[in-house]
Amino acid sequence: MKKVSPSYLKHQFLIAMPHMHDENFAQTLTYVVEHNANGAMGLVINRPQSLTLADVLEQLRPELPAPKRCQEIAIHAGGPVQTDRGFVLHPSGQTFQATVDLPGGISLSTSQDVLFSIADGYGPDQNVITLGYAGWDAGQLDAEMADNAWLTCSFDPAILFDVDSDQRLDAAARRLGINLALISTQAGHA
């Protein structure tokens, strides 16, 4: 018997199906940072909060006023796990104290210096900043996929960096030729 390797979803988008009722993930687009036999980690990239980079900087370095442009940089709700921890997706090329290069020419930075560099004008111009992440135990995401909770879409940096947050979910679905408004909210298996 031939052993089949599991199919992992690292570096793909997860599109929440319309029947997703979990408020943490309903109508979300999630970038999968890691997916292996031990579980998965992703960042929801289409849920901006009312919190801005200026608000975060006020907490991190209150002695310095945040530049006005920081009031325009939204902080996204990246998921329900460790909602006080920050993550920044940005194009590869700049390295910070805690930066991991990911496939497709993007990086994930988790140290405060990336936020300071963005605020001070020498950080990555293209970025998605989140607080929190989505986490799945071993086999959990695979089970959700089998239950038709998610669609997958290949990663596209334009969706991440060039499309407004509120349009990212539909943009990813369009890459698949799908209009989410036309999909039933009832889950099922054929």
Curated annotation (Swiss-Prot):
Question: Which domain of life does the UniProt lineage start with?
Answer: Bacteria
GO cellular component terms, alphabetically, are: cytosol
Provide the coiled-coil residue spans.
Answer: none
Which PANTHER family does the annotation name? Answer: UNCHARACTERIZED PROTEIN YQGE (PTHR30327), UPF0301 PROTEIN YQGE (PTHR30327:SF1)
Per the record, the similarity remark reads: Belongs to the UPF0301 (AlgH) family.
- In Swiss-Prot or TrEMBL terms, this protein is called UPF0301 protein PSPTO_5037
User: Which species?
Assistant: Pseudomonas syringae pv. tomato (strain ATCC BAA-871 / DC3000)
